[in-house]
Amino acid sequence: MTILKNQINKGIIFLIRCYQKYISPMFPPTCRYYPTCSNYAIDAIKKHGIVKGIIMGIFRILRCNPFVEGGVDVVPEKFTIFRNDDK
């Protein structure tokens, strides 16, 4: 089962990398956070697994809008859908 999970993780990460390489360059950079939302999603999947990682990535994308300040927001050690405010 872990081999299957590993392959699914790699497949999702591959799709995100394809987005980064082929789709993202067609648009001006707009992400207000570091790391970018797509890199955050990859890190979250690697750290927390596919389900929690995708959930964290989706909520990060929802937070990335013109009404927020942005800044550094790395993937926290513990699963959460909120911004990591560790200083």
From Swiss-Prot:
<keyword id="KW-0472">Membrane</keyword>
<dbReference type="GO" id="GO:0005886">
    <property type="term" value="C:plasma membrane"/>
</dbReference>
<keyword id="KW-1003">Cell membrane</keyword>
<dbReference type="InterPro" id="IPR002696">
    <property type="entry name" value="Membr_insert_effic_factor_YidD"/>
</dbReference>
<comment type="function">
    <text>Could be involved in insertion of integral membrane proteins into the membrane.</text>
</comment>
<comment type="similarity">
    <text>Belongs to the UPF0161 family.</text>
</comment>
<dbReference type="Pfam" id="PF01809">
    <property type="entry name" value="YidD"/>
</dbReference>
<protein>
    <recommendedName>
        <fullName>Putative membrane protein insertion efficiency factor</fullName>
    </recommendedName>
</protein>
